[in-house]
């Protein structure tokens, strides 16, 4: 699926969600990510990036609804600078994502859970200020689960925290030793999102 197909799906599904009930909401959000790749041997939430996008939400009742979005997200992993030789190393993965989530509102808080599909738009390695190709390369898609919560700050503005994890390996593990271990079967993106946004 190409990026144009993702955009088409978003534009096609948004009116359908809105048709579920006459009233629907749209919004935008921007923020930062911190991420790691499970199974890459680097460890730690040391890779920082940016994220942002738009969404539409359709209420099913006064407290329940669905939300679909279209987001850009930086993912990957990074080692801290070595204190002896000062080497650095990071995987830099860039995705366009379409999360589809169920939402439940309780006062100023709204809780979200669902699935996402991500399409890779670029990947590389940054080591000691030089870029290299990733080998073996990551798959050009990412499918996983996402959950989070939103705190409404007045009528229009909100802050949001979100966690996502791949459920299908983003690439086979380079060091697959235990066939009975789920996490040794491959690498999995894990991302924390910290966002501010506005409803329209």
Residue ranges and their predicted role:
Residues 21-57, 129, 191, 197-200:
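Short glycine/proline- and aromatic-enriched beta-strand/turn motifs that initiate or cap beta-hairpins
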Residues 22-24, 44-50, 92-96, 107, ...:
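Residues that define the transmembrane beta-barrel architecture of outer-membrane proteins
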Residues 28-32, 50-58, 70-72, 98-104, ...:
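Residues on the lipid-exposed face of transmembrane beta-strands in outer-membrane beta-barrel proteins
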Residues 33-37, 73-77, 118-122, 164-169:
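Structural signature of outer-membrane beta-barrel domains
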Residues 63-66, 108-111, 155-159:
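Repeated loop/turn-to-beta-strand initiation elements of outer-membrane beta-barrel proteins
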């Amino acid at each position: 699926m190409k990026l144009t197909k993702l955009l088409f799906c978003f534009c096609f599904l948004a009116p359908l969600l809105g048709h579920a009930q006459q009233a629907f909401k749209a919004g935008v959000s921007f923020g930062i990510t911190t991420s790691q790749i499970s199974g890459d041997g680097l460890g730690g939430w040391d890779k920082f990036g940016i994220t942002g996008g738009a969404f539409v939400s359709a209420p099913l009742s006064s407290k329940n609804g669905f939300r679909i979005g279209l987001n850009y997200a930086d993912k990957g992993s990074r080692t801290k600078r070595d204190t002896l030789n000062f080497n650095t190393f990071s995987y830099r993965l860039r995705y366009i994502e379409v999360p589809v989530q169920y939402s439940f509102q309780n006062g100023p808080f709204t809780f979200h859970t669902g699935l996402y599909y991500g399409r890779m738009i670029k990947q590389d390695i940054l080591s000691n200020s030089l870029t290299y190709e990733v080998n073996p390369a990551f798959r050009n898609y990412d499918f996983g689960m996402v959950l989070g919560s939103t705190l409404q700050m007045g009528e229009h503005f909100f802050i949001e925290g979100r966690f996502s994890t791949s459920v299908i390996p983003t690439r086979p593990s380079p060091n697959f030793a235990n066939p009975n271990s789920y996490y040794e079967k491959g690498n999995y993106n894990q991302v924390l999102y910290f966002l501010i946004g506005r409803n329209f």
